[in-house]
Each structure stands twice: as C-alpha cells, then as structure tokens.
Amino acid sequence: MSLRIDAVILAGGQARRMGGQDKGLVELLGKPMIEHAITRIQPQVKEILINANRNQNLYAQFADCVFGDEDSGFLGPLAGMVTAMGKTQADLLLVVPCDCPCLPTDLVARMAAALEAEAADLAVASDGEYEQPVVMLLKPSLRDSMKAFLAAGERKIDFWYAKHKVAVVSFADQPNAFVNVNTPEQVEQLSKALTQ
C-alpha cells in the first residue's frame, strides 16, 4: 500500500524584509516565487495546499485548497502547519516555504525513505551543514502536539520537533536547493545566478 503524501506551501508570513510584499507572489524570472516551488513539488505529491494569510484570491489560481491560519496574528510557520494538518487526508504532509524556488526534485522520495528507515515521526531537510526547519515531512497525527506547543506560547519550529523522533536528511549533494529569497536584492541575485 502506497502512502498518500500532500504538500503545504507556507506563504502566510508578513515578509518584512521584502518590504511587506507577499513573497510568494514576488516574481523571479517572470513567474511568481510560489510557482517555482509548485513546479518542483507537484510531481512528488498528490495534492498541494497553500497557507496564505493575504491575497488568497491570487493564490487560488495555484491550488484548490488555500487557507489562512486558524489562529490570527501571524504566529509564524507553525500556525500554518497546524492548520494544514487539519485540512489534509494524507498519511504524510510535506511542508515547504514559498520562497525556496530551487527545491530538490527528489525531496519527497529521500525524506520518506529516511522517515521509514529510522521509524521517525518526521523528517527534516539539511543542506549538509544546517537543518532547514521549514522543509519537513511529517505525520498529520502530530497536530495535537503542535497545537499544544503553540498554545503554550512557543513559536520555534526546531524546539517543537526536538520533542519528537526526527530523521535529518542531508541534501549536501544539492547545495543550492534551499536558497531562500527574503529581500529584493536576493531576488535579483538569484535571477542572475539562474540565468548564467
């Protein structure tokens, strides 16, 4: 029996370093940033969900399920993740940010393999040097744990996942896979790098 895997793309932040522009809709090489993430992720999952706290009508062109955080107040990525876990019927949920346009095309396969091999609750990607806390594959059954963590006033993803059995999956062979774009200058730099 194969597992159903859905993905949620997190686009719910305030994007302060992007001058308040909605990062997922900022264009990179003529396409919104989120479209780059979708192109990389779509073949790897059954359904894509988008967590967005603004411009939901614009995001609706990219996914059937677009939703805001259950708890208003921009509580960070965990708030989007906990909401997504309540909306999916999947066995596993892939979480990725909207501002990572170069995600690995073998992300799900490698993370699912590590999750199974290590009998872990979740898998977190690493660039070989640093863990990427907002790139993870997890069981939606962890929702209650995450809700309790948020209710206690906690916000840091890595503090939450440290409470569970975690498989860290290295993508050192793809050093630019998790390049994320936070400022207009970084958009320009990445545009140049991708067209060289």
Curated annotation (Swiss-Prot):
Its main location: cytoplasm. GO terms for cellular component: cytoplasm. The keyword Membrane does not apply. The keyword Metal-binding applies. The gene is mobA. Its cofactor is Mg(2+). Belongs to the MobA family. Monomer. This is Molybdenum cofactor guanylyltransferase. GTP binds at residues 10-12, 23, 51, 69, 99. It comes from Shewanella amazonensis (strain ATCC BAA-1098 / SB2B). Transfers a GMP moiety from GTP to Mo-molybdopterin (Mo-MPT) cofactor (Moco or molybdenum cofactor) to form Mo-molybdopterin guanine dinucleotide (Mo-MGD) cofactor. It is an enzyme of class 2 (transferase). The N-terminal domain determines nucleotide recognition and specific binding, while the C-terminal domain determines the specific binding to the target protein.
